[in-house]
Amino acid sequence: MDFGASAKNLSTPVKGAKIVPNMTVDELVKEYAGCAFGAGRLAEAVDIYYEMLASGKTTKFFGLAGAMTPAGMRNIIADLIRDGYIDVLVTTGANMVHDTVEALGLHHYKGSDCANDIQLRHECIDRIYDVYLPDQHFTDLEEFLQGVYSGLPQENLSIRQVLTEIGKNLDDDSSILKTAAEMGVPVYCPALQDSVIGLQAWLYKEGNPLHVDAFADMHEFMDICYGAESAGTMLLGGGVPKNYILQSMLVTPRSFDYAIQLTMDRPETGGLSGATLDEAQSWGKVGEDAKSVTVYADSTITLPLIVSAVRTRLSKR
């Protein structure tokens, strides 16, 4: 038996969490740190995210996939942007669709995943797992978007510029797009066509001049990557936002120094959404000495816990 190796592998005992009344979220997370499995990973994510946000030299990327805005996560993200904790946001079109719906005063409603979907269809109600919204919301959204598109400059625009203009036309401090436009934080959506915002842009373009270059954002995005002294990313889910962020480092001399992934996807099928951050190291996307962790849990549970704990630590600096 190699007693030296055994001593190394048996150096950190699992410490049972102790829960007491009136604990803060950060105190709870510190108890998680002594635990294994998902609890230990979440505590590690808090440590990494704190270091990433506290660093004065790290460019902070945020990947937003899934249905985070209809689930109620938009305030958290808007506040992170407002307080300077997101430098670059990459998102799916759907998240910005539902952000805009809310910004127009149109609500999402708590429903049930056990609904009769045929009945919901007859009632003109759309379902996103256990969230409902009426079809009429999309009619109102479409009217708003058509008005925005009609006021766009008659020149070649990037998708980022289109999203900025949408944000400028919103009046809701909880809006991700409005906050990003006010703070000068770029919002990139490489697959905007895969959303109502993109669909309405195409419909408008069928009868009106609208010039959007789907590749125009690449140069600007790569300039940000090249200019980053250090880079870190928080990835909610996978898909296009995750890959768009991570692949950017393939054309720069560096890799991500910090990376956190909150996901429910599995790696066994070989898809990007479930790919581990360790796998990303083989591509050079995440650095050899990077601080990284994947937390396998619902992002609507883990993101609020992580952000709350990190904000507590940041307030004590």
UniProtKB/Swiss-Prot annotation:
Name a GO molecular-function annotation: deoxyhypusine synthase activity
Q: A Pfam family matched by this chain, by name?
A: DS
Q: Which cofactor does it need?
A: NAD(+)
Active-site residues, Swiss-Prot/TrEMBL: 285
Per UniProt, the keywords (alphabetical) are: Hypusine biosynthesis, NAD, Transferase
Q: In which pathway does it act?
A: Protein modification; eIF5A hypusination
In terms of superkingdom, the source organism counts as: Archaea
E.C. number, please? 2.5.1.46
GO cellular component labels: cytoplasm
Q: Which Gene3D superfamilies match?
A: Deoxyhypusine synthase
Catalysed reactions, as listed in the record: [eIF5A protein]-L-lysine + spermidine = [eIF5A protein]-deoxyhypusine + propane-1,3-diamine
Q: What does this protein do?
A: Catalyzes the NAD-dependent oxidative cleavage of spermidine and the subsequent transfer of the butylamine moiety of spermidine to the epsilon-amino group of a specific lysine residue of the eIF-5A precursor protein to form the intermediate deoxyhypusine residue.
HAMAP family from the entry? DHS
**According to its UniProt record, which protein family does this protein belong to?**
Belongs to the deoxyhypusine synthase family.
Enumerate the NCBIfam families for this protein: dhys, PRK02301.1
Record-given protein name: Probable deoxyhypusine synthase 1
Source organism (scientific name): Methanosarcina mazei (strain ATCC BAA-159 / DSM 3647 / Goe1 / Go1 / JCM 11833 / OCM 88) (Methanosarcina frisia)
Q: Which gene encodes it?
A: dys1
